[in-house]
Amino acid sequence: MNIQQATRQYETWLAGHVRVVKSDLGTKHELMAQDAFLFLRATFYRWMQLFPALCPKAASAPTVLAIGDLHVENYGTWRDAEGRLVWGINDFDEAFPLPYTIDLVRLAASAWLAVELGHLSLVPANACAAILEGYTKGLEDGGEPFVLAEKRPLLREIVTSRLRDPTLFWEQFAALPTIRPVPAKVMLMLKQEIGRAHV
C-alpha cells in the first residue's frame, strides 16, 4: 500500500467516526507536502503501518499507554488544578496501548527532521541522546509534573514570552484565509467591548 492509498483508507475510516470537512483535508494535504516534518506530523496512521516492519526489535518492546503521535510540537504549557504553569505533552488524541518505543523513536525522528529543516539548533545525535536521557530520568524520578515555577527558570522564561517573540505566530495566523466573515453585528459588539476595556 502506498501513501496515497493509506491516506484514502485512513480518511475513509475517519469519516466513519467524525464529520470530515473536505476543504480542511485539502489544506492538510497541502501542508503535508510542504516538508518532511509536517508530513510526519500528519501521518501517524502511516507510521503505525510501517513501524513494525522497519523497526521490528523496537516494535516488540513492552506495551504502555503511549502518546502515539508524539513529536516535538506536541509539547506545551497549561495550568494544573493548583494554577501552576506546567510544561509537557499536550496532545493525547491518538494515545493507545503501544510499545513504549513508539514514542521514543517518533519523537527522535521528529527532532531529527526539525534539525534538518532548521527548526531546531541542535546536533541530531545530541537531541536523540537528550530524549533518551530525559525519558530514563523521568522513569527513575517517578514521573513528577514539570512545574515551571519550581525548578525550570529558563524554560519558564521562554514560555512566558520574555524570550519568545509572538510576531511569527500572529503573522501566520493573520495569513490564514477567512472561511466565513464575522457577522457585522458580532463585529460591532466586539468593537464596543474593546472600546469599553480601554476607557
Regions found by a protein language model. Name each.
Residues 101-110:
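Catalytic or ion-translocation cores adjacent to nucleophile or general acid/base/metal-coordination motifs
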